[in-house]
Amino acid sequence: MRRSAVAVLAAGLFFTGAGSAVADAWRNMPTLKSTGVKLTKGKYRMYPKFTKHGGFGFKANLVDDEHGDGHNVYVQARVEGYSWRRFNGQQKKTVRIQKEVYDGAALYVSNAYIRACRDRGSLRPDNCTRTLHYTRR
């Protein structure tokens, strides 16, 4: 009797953990494109509390789409109530970026935003893709 109760309890814990892992799996992100910059093969996830600060994680290829323009590219990401964090790419290259953005004062974040931009210098404004908004499910 006791062994079967332990077996049932262990199976329940196993399937609960498997369900949590699926709920926090990586999800696909659409390709973002603007003049001179692309963010491709993107995936994101909202980490559960106590895992990577309960933050927003993303991984994608940041592509300098116009090699001859002499401008750098970068990704910006932010979570609710905070300013944009900038992650630089390289000119004339494709760079794989994997980062986490989080609120250090909270157990987890509920809203996250991401976009890719081309740095056109100080005299002209940068051009950015549309901003994607993700919420915790």
Identify the meaning behind each predicted range.
Residues 23-137:
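Post-signal peptide N-terminal regions of Sec-secreted extracellular proteins
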Residues 1-23:
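Secretory targeting and sorting signals
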